[in-house]
Amino acid sequence: MTKSDLKNGTAAYVGPLDKSATKVTIPATVKIDGVTFKVTSIEKNAFKNNKKVKTVTIGKNVSKIGAKAFYGCSKLKTLKIKTTKLTAKKIGSKAFSKTPKSMKVTIPKKKFKTYKSMLIKRGVNKKAKFKKS
């Protein structure tokens, strides 16, 4: 589910429509009423305390992840990040806190070191398995 900004041609992911979904892909773009929008952000609390989701893929246009976006996602086993547009200031506080220690995180090769450090600072456990895509 998204909210959109017609003027900028962007959309924000606010959370899954199907609260029981175990696999979620946040797309690079969405089409609303025939208009294509780039999905550039994941809103704060988008998946907060979601106990069902196991796999999340973040699309290539996402440049912002809100505070506590994935907080308390206790079943999240796989996180695939396709975007190279994230910065430390654009990942909100505790965005990944209280996620499993055994989570597998796939990061774009050219951003591996930077993203790994940023994600740990925002709550991904140091024991998570990080790999390059």
Language-model features: where?
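Short, surface-exposed, low-complexity cationic segments
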Residues: 11, 23-24, 45
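Intrinsically disordered, low-complexity repeat and linker tracts
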Residues: 1, 13, 125-133
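Structural signature of tandem-repeat unit edges
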Residues: 19-41, 51-64, 74-89, 100-114, ...
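Short beta-strand/loop segment at the start of cytosolic alpha/beta domains
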Residues: 1-17
